[in-house]
């Protein structure tokens, strides 16, 4: 590789003993690439390491982990107000890696690492909920959220993204729809929602394409609602009739307001947020991310 400015890798602590990653970093260092590595231990570490990255003058901060790690690092980057923030690099090491997968990030660690360091930095959108909590990939509510948050860690570690589906099938008889009202630009719907997906990215829950037309640089959020009063019949219909399915409601808007008569929970890139009122808005061009030239999430 040619000479590139230094990067700082923020590595999820669960991947600290990843031997192939150590070898990939060593090879790049042998080529003269400067890579600082910091390992997270607790919440807030990503913010501290992003602050350190600025002091070191690196041009790229690489998020090494799953969607939650990418969320923490990207949120810390968009909070930078003075000067130019480092670009975000993606190194998928989590259970599902939904955002990185849909963005076309290579699965091979060495290729992903090279892209994170040397890829073109593109401006992409993020989203913010209730003027506070951000997500880069997707906010999911209803059946999918409860499954994602309740799936045991050991099952996720053993089976990866498939674990969400297995745990969901085990819990189907106890899950009911969420009644809510959703408004957006030229959009209004109310009823019983089995699953709600509001996507900057396209997939969640270990590869489920909830918002298949979403783009990360169009200034819009994509909405998909899976409706129905009875879970099993509605889910069967959704899986077998994807075109013109009455159980699927789609929308697109720069913002969505959600009201529920009871508390519901949204999963924001793995981080649960509960309440009855949600204002979700897009943040156009919020950060720069190093992506492949043929990234399917770019218009």
Curated annotation (Swiss-Prot):
Keywords of this entry: ATP-binding, Cytoplasm, Kinase, Lipid biosynthesis, Lipid metabolism, Magnesium, Metal-binding, Nucleotide-binding, Phospholipid biosynthesis, Phospholipid metabolism, Transferase
Primary role: Probably phosphorylates lipids; the in vivo substrate is unknown.
Top EC category: transferase
GO biological process terms on file: phospholipid biosynthetic process
Cofactor(s) this protein requires: Mg(2+); Ca(2+)
CC cofactor note: Binds 1 Mg(2+) ion per subunit. Ca(2+) may be able to substitute.
EC number: 2.7.1.-
Subcellular location: Cytoplasm
Position of the signal peptide: none
Sequence positions that bind Mg(2+): 215, 218, 220
GO molecular function, one term: lipid kinase activity
The organism of origin for this protein: Salmonella newport (strain SL254)
Magnesium keyword on record: yes
Transmembrane annotation, as ranges: none
Active site: 271 (proton acceptor)
GO cellular component: cytoplasm; plasma membrane
Protein name from the UniProt record: Probable lipid kinase YegS
Family per similarity comment: Belongs to the diacylglycerol/lipid kinase family. YegS lipid kinase subfamily.
